[in-house]
């Protein structure tokens, strides 16, 4: 049996949710091998998620749209990385860029382990003519399998990340505030994963108007025009879209929330990293493909189990073949009831 490597390069560039899913696997591995050095290369945006890091983990932000753009950028990156004298590469991405980097390291006789994404299984489970419907390996297990190929295992359990920042004064809970704080992240990258905005607005407004809840809405400045109008409807709605809080402050805020309502999205994963309960709404995609957040189960998911057409997509990027996204015909009342049940279950 070959000895375990001492200096490991870990590659996972994107997407944000997938990079977030690396943390519950990589952190325990790093802490189980304090004598070894780990370096993760990822996108500048995703690098901001890596807080409360193990001391032997270095996170390098690699901008593939600027200095590391294209084929030339891959060679530039390799020339820089080879100076670090890594003795193993864990490719958690398996796309053209990571394949090329891995190949260049192989030419230098560096040991490489690559993720099996289960692409064939995922195509089968989302096919109209699927012959089986079962839980596939989670991304967490697929990441762990890569480290296992390098002889790196751990029995350590992942613990939620420590709050990375102090909240600004206007986000501090006052002594007289007895409301339950709820987060809402109403967007994901693809239409097939987005709960209709009119329905989500009903959810947010109905919760806020009870006076029992304060609702914080997460989104980008591009979402502000829509979400700021929600804020104007009820006093207990706070839109964070134009606040420029940054990931660290948003992650710190999540630790103060009773629950986060999300899509199958990066915010689902970020909330679970902070140990915050989640209610996640799934449409075209399905937890069986392996992307459910850390520690979540079917009780955290709202979905249309009666539809045989779903999942029709692994990532939610395929247009609905019926044109109506019937998978998102989920009533606001059902979402509200599940949120209240989650909060009551927490406070009992």
Give names to the regions the model predicted.
Residues 1-348:
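Catalytic machinery of carbohydrate-active enzymes
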């Amino acid at each position: 049996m070959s000895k375990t490597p001492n200096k490991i390069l870990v590659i996972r560039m994107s997407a944000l949710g997938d990079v977030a899913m690396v943390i519950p696997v990589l952190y325990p591995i790093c802490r189980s091998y304090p004598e070894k050095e780990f370096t993760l290369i990822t996108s500048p945006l995703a690098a901001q998620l890596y807080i409360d890091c193990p001391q032997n983990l270095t996170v390098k932000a690699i901008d593939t749209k600027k200095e590391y753009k294209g084929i030339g950028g891959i060679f530039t990156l390799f020339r820089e990385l080879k100076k670090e004298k890594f003795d193993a590469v864990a490719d958690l991405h398996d796309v053209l860029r990571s394949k090329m980097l891995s190949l260049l390291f192989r030419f230098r006789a560096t040991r490489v382990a690559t993720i099996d994404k289960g692409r064939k299984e995922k195509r089968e489970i989302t096919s109209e003519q699927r012959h089986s419907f079962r839980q596939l390996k989670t991304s967490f297990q697929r990441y762990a399998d890569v480290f296992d190929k390098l002889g790196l295992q751990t029995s350590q359990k992942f613990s939620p990340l420590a709050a990375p920042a102090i909240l600004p004064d206007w986000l501090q809970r006052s002594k007289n505030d007895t409301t339950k704080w709820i987060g809402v992240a109403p967007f994901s990258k693809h239409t097939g994963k987005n709960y209709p905005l009119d329905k989500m607005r009903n959810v947010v407004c109905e919760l806020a108007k009870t006076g029992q809840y304060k609702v914080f809405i997460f989104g980008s400045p591009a979402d502000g025009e829509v979400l700021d109008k929600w804020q104007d409807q009820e006093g207990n709605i706070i839109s964070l879209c134009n606040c420029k809080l940054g990931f660290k402050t948003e992650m710190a805020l999540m630790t103060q929330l009773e629950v986060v309502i999300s899509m199958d999205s990066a915010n689902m994963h970020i909330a679970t990293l902070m140990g915050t309960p989640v209610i996640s709404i799934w449409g075209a995609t399905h937890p069986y493909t392996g992307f459910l957040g850390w520690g979540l189960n079917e009780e955290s998911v709202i979905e249309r189990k009666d539809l045989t057409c779903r999942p029709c997509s692994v990532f939610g990027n395929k247009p609905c073949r019926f044109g109506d996204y019937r998978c998102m015909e989920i009533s606001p009342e059902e979402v509200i009831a599940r949120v209240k049940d989650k909060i009551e279950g927490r406070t009992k």
